[in-house]
Amino acid sequence: MAKLDETLTMLKDLTDAKGIPGNEREVRQVMKSYIEPFADEVTTDRLGSLIAKKTGAENGPKIMIAGHLDEVGFMVTQITDKGFIRFQTVGGWWAQVMLAQRVTIVTKKGEITGVIGSKPPHILSPEARKKSVEIKDMFIDIGASSREEALEWGVLPGDMIVPHFEFTVMNNEKFLLAKAWDNRIGCAIAIDVLRNLQNTDHPNIVYGVGTVQEEVGLRGAKTAAHTIQPDIAFGVDVGIAGDTPGISEKEAQSKMGKGPQIIVYDASMVSHKGLRDAVVATAEEAGIPYQFDAIAGGGTDSGAIHLTANGVPALSITIATRYIHTHAAMLHRDDYENAVKLITEVIKKLDRKTVDEITYQ
């Protein structure tokens, strides 16, 4: 693997960290360690979201950049007499990407390696072999011989189970493969926007936020937004890349490496037109590539944030990503860097007058 520079080291640390919804502590600590040098203060709300505040002007408009800390994973629900683990998915999973995948169970005594198993195809009927194994029929094998042995190792119902995958820089070093891009890339964007603004004069109060429990209903975004009361918000997340075999442009038109995605519509929100226009104008002026997209079957933290208090103009800016909600997703470094650049340039242009124009035009 290529030698990791400062950015790649941060991305590796963020994606290697383990944190399903409700269990984001490790990820929060990693994000805090990277964002704290660029913030005036860092706090955590009572649900667990990290809020890093950087003040440009004391009475300036509040700009919220939210990426969620949590990743899709699993939770221990039962231990069988023979020491196998029954589990619950936490976040959205597709059964076809799960079998024979390595996982890590995080217990009070330490981490335990397991593998997702099911009945072997060799003993299935020809009809059964043609069907996907249902998640309810899967289990996790940790090499225990009994329930007592698993308990002795520290495994308990409610323990977090996380996909295991090593952060990898591909042969084309712009292509990055890792677990949990959804949504550690959003956390990284929030960190680097605050990094860019550390020596920049601007009349805004900027909040870089790592929200919790996005994958189970945008829950942390709701409490964080109530805490901040933002005037403008950006949800930063992964989006769908439509550049692999079998996907038509009608289904997904974005391509990796062609710029961040500006989401005009998703299942949780109709994007704010004034904010969309301001972002597009900034991208055009700065020569930053971008792509439009709409996601009928998913949403981001913007969906919760825009409904806060008396309403918040919000826009999702996402990174085209292959194979999301699996053990190994892939994205393009240029898209990440251009997303950071775009949001930074937008914030530099914002002030109270501009925010009011965006909001009420």
From Swiss-Prot:
A divalent metal cation 1 binds at H68, D182, D237. Pfam families: Peptidase_M42 (PF05343). Keywords: Aminopeptidase, Hydrolase, Metal-binding, Metalloprotease, Protease. A divalent metal cation 2 binds at D182, E215, H325. SUPFAM superfamilies: Aminopeptidase/glucanase lid domain, Zn-dependent exopeptidases. The active site is at E214. Belongs to the peptidase M42 family. Homododecamer. Putative aminopeptidase. This is Putative aminopeptidase YsdC. It comes from Bacillus subtilis (strain 168). The lineage of its organism: Bacteria, Bacillati, Bacillota, Bacilli, Bacillales. The gene is ysdC.
